[in-house]
Amino acid sequence: MSESILIVIFFFFSFLIIAENGPHLLVEAEQAKVFSHRGGNVTLPCKFYRDPTAFGSGIHKIRIKWTKLTSDYLKEVDVFVSMGYHKKTYGGYQGRVFLKGGSDSDASLVITDLTLEDYGRYKCEVIEGLEDDTVVVALDLQGMYL
């Protein structure tokens, strides 16, 4: 290899290392806890923000994954996964969950016809290439007042 090609390769990989430092994806929830009642509908909030100036931003499809955390936090149960036009719903959530889709950066999950088993903590994970971030949202039962 010529010396000029080696120099170009060196600078290219140096640029990759510099460009990849620091997070370029941030996931947030407007509320850490939401309330609803049995049989009702609820939106679990989740929004993500990308750094459009980051190297490689926008070349990978965004993958959104929602899981429910078990009460001991040792296991995650798959609820919903979306990547582009591809979507998959798991278990008892089939036909009852979908992404709100208010904007391109909205990963909020809508759950309809809530059951007692739906209450608990949910994790929203957004993945773009090698970058990922998560947020946890609690779904609690709304009390009934007489």
Regions inferred by a protein language model and the residue ranges of each:
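Ligand-binding face of N-terminal immunoglobulin V-set domains in extracellular IgSF glycoproteins
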Residues: 94-138
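Amphipathic alpha-helical protein-protein interaction segments
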Residues: 35-37, 55, 86, 100, ...
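N-terminal Sec-dependent signal peptide, specifically the hydrophobic helical h-region
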Residues: 1-40
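Flexible inter-domain hinge/linker segments at boundaries of tandem extracellular adhesion modules
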Residues: 13-28, 67-72, 90, 103, ...
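Short, conserved beta-strand segments of beta-strand-rich sandwich/propeller modules, principally
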Residues: 43, 63, 119-123
